[in-house]
Amino acid sequence: MSLAARVAARLGLPIGELEPLPGGHSGLTYTTKAGVHQYVVKAVPPGQKPVGRNDILRQARILRALAGSRVPVPGVIAVDEQAPAWFAMEFAEGEAIEPVLDAHTLAPELAGSRMLEAARVLRNLHEVAPPPEAPIGAAGELERWTRTMHAVPAELRPGAEDLLKRLADVPGDLPPVLVHGDFRLGNVLFAGDRASAVVDWEIWSVGDPRVDLGWFLLFADHRNFPALGTPVPGLPTESELLHAYQGKHAVPEMRWFRALSRMKMAAIMGHNLRRHREGKHHDPDQERLPPTIAAMIRTATDLLA
């Protein structure tokens, strides 16, 4: 039975065509209509194992766990565990724009309001009781991204070894929370200045809240992305975003986590550039990355000097 037939049978309604959803989604992601309702369907690609980013059942579980919380997420409508597994969720209205990286016509004032609202949504996320999973601490995060960095050719990561030595002085962990893993405006849908849904839960985990926070702050300043970023006047500073997130309670050791996020971004970009140059994923835009990779490593090192 085709995926479309399985979805229609589970919903008990005839559906329209499964149309691929544009954007950088893992697995197979479609939109479809059933009557007046629109849905998003995520499925494991045929022949692939439901692990990592393709473990869509794990994504469905966390969306269901967050239903009714102060974190806006699409409602899960149906889940089918039969291989290849899939689930259907509500189509969340809104737009997801990364102000300093995406081409857009968003007013700077609205971009700033959205960043402050996202900081509050992140705080709400970290106040949700985490699922009963083994937490990944700061040391585990460092180990994971160190492996990725070491897979990048040395000439693409100048200064990385010095940075990794500095990062080896790992701070103690805060109590574990639910971590989104890629929390930024590009993964939060907005209607005006109101967050309508946090999406793309492929790499959620239980861990230190500062992992999410450091990553989110990275996208507040175009200067972090030489040759890629665009100035957006009036965006909140990192200090203003931290205040929106933490209120009166200071978050310790953020300097280390801001450096970790830069190392992580450099490792991801270096990995993508290597794949392009090896012919594994043709994308000429990857050739724009070296200045940002170098800047990420340099500024991370400066943070820990």
Feature-to-residue mapping (PLM):
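Juxta-kinase regulatory segment immediately upstream of eukaryotic protein kinase catalytic domains
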Residues: M1-L13
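Conserved N-terminal boundary motif of the eukaryotic protein kinase catalytic domain
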Residues: L13-E19
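ATP-binding pocket architecture of kinase catalytic cores
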Residues: E19-G140, R144-R166, P171-D173
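Conserved protein kinase catalytic-loop anchor
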Residues: P176-L178, S196
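Catalytic-loop of the protein kinase fold
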Residues: L178-H180, L185
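Activation of the activation-loop gatekeeper triad in protein kinase-fold domains
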Residues: V199-W204
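Active-site activation/catalytic loop segments of kinase-like enzymes and analogous catalytic loops
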Residues: L213-H249, S261-G279
